[in-house]
Regions:
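Iron-sulfur cluster-binding cysteine motifs and their immediate structural context
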Residues: 9-11, 15-33, 92
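Amphipathic alpha-helical scaffolding segments comprising HEAT/armadillo-like alpha-solenoid repeats
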Residues: 55-60, 86-98, 118-130, 151-161
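Long C-terminal interaction/binding lobes of large macromolecular proteins
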Residues: 103, 108, 123, 127, ...
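Alpha-helix N-cap/helix-start positions at coil->helix boundaries
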Residues: 67, 71-72, 87, 101-104, ...
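Structural detector for internal amphipathic alpha-helices that build alpha-solenoid repeat scaffolds
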Residues: 74-86, 95, 106-118, 138-151
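Glycine-rich phosphate/pyrophosphate-binding loop
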Residues: 38-75
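Non-heme iron-sulfur electron-transfer modules
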Residues: 1-4, 23-53
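Ferredoxin-like iron-sulfur electron-transfer modules
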Residues: 1-12, 66-68, 99
């Protein structure tokens, strides 16, 4: 359920500004200096997955995303790719699944691959499951494989993980 609620947001600060009662009715469009940088607030998602700590600090250091840190932003990028069912992201998600040292990111990549589907994703999930040392990440991989299996008989292809 958490994955569904995040949707395609990388961080929630923009949403808070939109719904804040203090900001209701304010028109910030005439203050160019307050306009968000599109590259910062809506970055390309796949490059975020390979971003180093230094690159993250350089790119997001002056934004509200910086206080969240790289890991949550990368996790949320993986979730967004899963929600978009972005097939072109499968190779990058497989790299996260196979190579990332963080079990949370490996498990989240498994979830995204389960949402996107395809033979390449399924092969990678099966291979990853055989060598996954973390029990929670392994459970996410199993759930993703189950979602892929149920997608053949389900119209939506979606099983909440």
């Amino acid at each position: 359920a958490q994955m569904r609620k995040i949707g395609n947001r990388l961080y929630g600060c923009d949403t808070c500004q939109i719904v804040c009662p203090v900001n209701r009715g304010k028109d910030w469009t005439h203050h160019e200096e307050l306009a968000p940088d599109p590259e910062t607030v809506k970055p390309l998602l796949v490059p975020l997955l390979q971003m180093s700590n230094r690159e993250f600090k350089e790119r997001f250091g002056a934004s509200a995303a910086a206080w969240r840190g790289k890991k949550p932003i990368q996790r949320n990028a993986v979730i967004a790719l899963g929600h978009f069912r972005e097939a072109s992201a499968v190779p990058a998600l497989i790299r996260v699944l196979m190579d990332d040292p963080r079990p949370v990111l490996r498990g989240t990549a498994a979830w995204a691959l389960g949402r996107i589907g395809g033979a390449e994703a399924e092969r990678a999930l099966r291979e990853a499951l055989a060598g996954e040392p973390d029990p929670e990440a392994a459970e996410r991989i199993r759930a993703a494989l189950e979602a892929l299996g149920s997608s053949e008989s389900s119209e939506s292809g979606f099983q909440e993980v």
